[in-house]
Amino acid sequence: MPAPADIQAATLNKFLAAWREGSAPDTMALWSDDFKQRLLPLSLGESSFRSRDQAALFYPGLVENLRNWELHIKEIVHDSARGTAAVYATSQADTPFSGEKWTNEYAIFLSFSEDGTKVCRLEEMMDSAFYQSFVPKFQRYLMGLGGLKK
């Protein structure tokens, strides 16, 4: 049985505040031990879920490299009876790549832990055109193969 709606809502508000602030530590503190994350649409080829440890390898590096981060939450749907929430948002930021902005559009789907205090599942529907353009460059950058112009 899902946790009470007010507990879930408090967790959702903390998650959204951490996302809005671009705080990887605060976001990850809300991930349950059995947290799993998946990128959507499935056409991106990312059909399997990442574990908490796998997601933690990429997420902090991404957040730390986005400057002047702005998140605009457009819609929130919280289904407390199912222990889930959906959020539609857009974001923009400066990236490590000269002349290239982060401009992304999301629909995220969260599931709460049984006690409602953690996020146990996160599915992120991303702008596939942006993802296919940005993510390979960023992965190379994180591996030290890309160039950062100073």
Curated annotation (Swiss-Prot):
Q: In which pathway does it act?
A: Secondary metabolite biosynthesis
Named from the GO MF annotations, one term is:
monooxygenase activity
User: What SUPFAM superfamilies does the entry give?
Assistant: NTF2-like
The family line of this record is: Belongs to the avfA family.
Q: What PANTHER family does the record tag this protein with?
A: AUSTINOID BIOSYNTHESIS CLUSTERS PROTEIN F-RELATED, AUSTINOL SYNTHESIS PROTEIN F-RELATED
Residues crossing the lipid bilayer are none
Root EC class = oxidoreductase
Offer one Pfam family short name for this entry. Answer: SnoaL_2
Question: Per its UniProt entry, which superkingdom is the organism in?
Answer: Eukaryota
- Please give the organism: Aspergillus novofumigatus (strain IBT 16806)
User: Which keywords does the record carry?
Assistant: Monooxygenase, Oxidoreductase
Its EC number is: 1.-.-.-
Gene symbol of the encoding locus: nsrS
- Can you say what this protein is called? Monooxygenase nsrS
Describe the task this protein carries out.
Monooxygenase; part of the gene cluster that mediates the biosynthesis of the tetrahydroxanthone dimer neosartorin, which exhibits antibacterial activity. The two different monomeric units appear to be synthesized by the same set of enzymes, among which the Baeyer-Villiger monooxygenase nsrF is the key enzyme for the divergence of the biosynthetic routes. The pathway begins with the synthesis of atrochrysone thioester by the polyketide synthase nsrB. The atrochrysone carboxyl ACP thioesterase nsrC then breaks the thioester bond and releases the atrochrysone carboxylic acid from AacuL.
